[in-house]
Design a protein with these regions (language model features):
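N-terminal targeting leaders of membrane proteins
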Residues: 11, 16-125, 152-154, 163-176, ...
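Interfacial segments of alpha-helical transmembrane regions
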Residues: 124-147
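Lipid-exposed faces of alpha-helical membrane segments in multi-pass integral membrane proteins
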Residues: 54-65, 112-119, 143, 147, ...
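Sec-dependent signal peptide recognition
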Residues: 2-9
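Structural signal for the C-terminal ends of transmembrane alpha-helices
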Residues: 121-126, 197-201
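Transmembrane alpha-helix/helix-exit interface in multi-pass inner-membrane proteins
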Residues: 144-162
Length: 284
C-alpha cells in the first residue's frame, strides 16, 4: 500500500505543476472566458494553516503507526493454515473463498483512480484552485492510507484464498495473506471518486452533470470491490467496510474545508435608464 501512496504523491505533483502552467496560459490568451457549468468565480473552500497541519500530520502518524504494526506481523505457519475452518466464516462472507487469481484483480482500477483528479483541469475554477485542491487530495490519501494500514495490521484477518486448498502454499505464507480487513483497493478508489465528485458538486451548477458524476463515483469503487472479492482477495464485509470508510473520507474532507461565509457581487447595466444595478448576496 505504501508504494501506492508514493505513486499518488508523484501523480499529484505532476497534476499541480501542469495545472499551474495551463491556468496561466489560459488567462493570458482568453481572460474573459467563463465556464457555463460553473457556479461563480468564488472558491467554495478555504485553507487554514493549523487545520492542514493537523490533517496532514494525522495522516503521517497513522501511516507510521500502520507500518510499525504490520511490520511486526508474522506469516501463518503450515499448522495454522491447516487448522483454518471454513465453517468459522459467516455465510455472508463464505462465497468469497476461492483460489487466488492475479488477473483482473482491481489493480488497473486502483491505478486509474489516481488520474481522476486530473479532471479538475477541465474546469476553469477548479483549475484556478489547483493548489488548494491538491492539498485537500493529499489529506484524503494520507488519512485513508493511514487508517487502512493501521486497521489491517490490528485486525490481521486472513484472506479468503488462504482457506482454499487450490491456492499455492507460498502465497498463503505471506504477511499480506493476513491483511484482508479492510479492502485497501476499494477504500482508496472510493475516497478518490467521492472526493472528485464532491468537489465538482461544489463548483458546478448543472444538475445533470453532477448527477452523472456521482453515479460514476459510486460505481467505480463498487466495481473495484467486486473484482477484489471475485479474485479471492477479500470477503464481502472487507469490501463494504472499505467502500464506506473511503467514501466518508473523500466526502467529508471537502466538507470541513467549506468556507463559513460567501460573498457574491454582481452588476449589470440597465440600458433603458442608463443606470447600473448592483446585486449583493451574503450567505452563511
Amino acid at each position: 500500500m505504501k508504494k501506492y501512496f508514493t505513486i499518488i504523491l508523484i501523480v499529484c505533483t505532476c497534476t499541480l505543476s501542469y495545472g499551474q502552467s495551463h491556468f496561466i496560459h489560459n488567462n493570458q490568451t482568453n481572460p474573459s472566458f467563463e465556464d457555463p457549468y460553473s457556479i461563480n468565480s468564488v472558491s467554495p473552500y478555504g485553507l487554514e494553516l493549523e487545520r492542514e497541519i493537523v490533517l496532514l500530520g494525522s495522516g503521517v502518524l497513522l501511516n507510521i503507526s500502520g507500518l510499525i504494526v504490520t511490520n511486526n506481523i508474522s506469516p501463518l505457519t503450515v499448522q495454522e493454515i491447516n487448522e483454518l475452518d471454513v465453517n468459522d466464516i459467516s455465510s455472508f462472507d463464505r462465497n468469497a473463498i476461492k483460489p487466488h487469481r492475479e488477473e483482473v484483480n482491481g489493480d488497473l482500477l486502483l491505478y486509474g483512480s489516481f488520474l481522476l483528479p486530473l479532471t479538475f483541469l477541465a474546469n476553469d475554477n477548479t483549475r484556478r484552485d489547483w493548489q488548494m485542491l491538491g492539498v485537500m487530495w493529499l489529506e484524503v490519501m494520507a488519512i485513508q492510507s493511514g487508517i487502512n494500514l493501521l486497521i489491517k495490521g490490528l485486525a490481521q484477518r486472513t484472506r479468503p484464498y488462504v482457506y482454499d486448498p487450490n491456492t499455492p502454499l507460498e502465497k498463503k505464507q505471506t504477511v499480506g495473506a493476513r491483511l484482508s480487513f479492510y479492502s485497501g483497493h476499494t477504500s482508496t478508489t472510493a475516497a478518490t471518486t467521492f472526493y472528485v465528485a464532491r468537489v465538482f458538486s461544489d463548483y458546478l451548477s448543472n444538475k445533470t452533470v453532477k448527477t452523472l458524476i456521482w453515479i460514476g463515483a459510486a460505481i467505480y469503487p463498487a466495481l473495484t470491490g467486486y473484482l477484489r472479492r471475485d479474485t479471492g482477495n477479500h470477503f464481502r464485509t472487507d469490501v463494504i467496510t472499505g467502500y464506506l470508510i473511503g467514501a466518508a473520507i473523500g466526502y467529508f474532507i471537502p466538507e470541513i474545508h467549506m468556507r463559513n461565509e460567501a460573498l457574491n457581487l454582481s452588476f449589470y447595466r440597465n440600458f433603458n435608464n442608463e443606470s447600473v444595478n448592483i446585486s449583493l448576496n451574503y450567505s452563511f
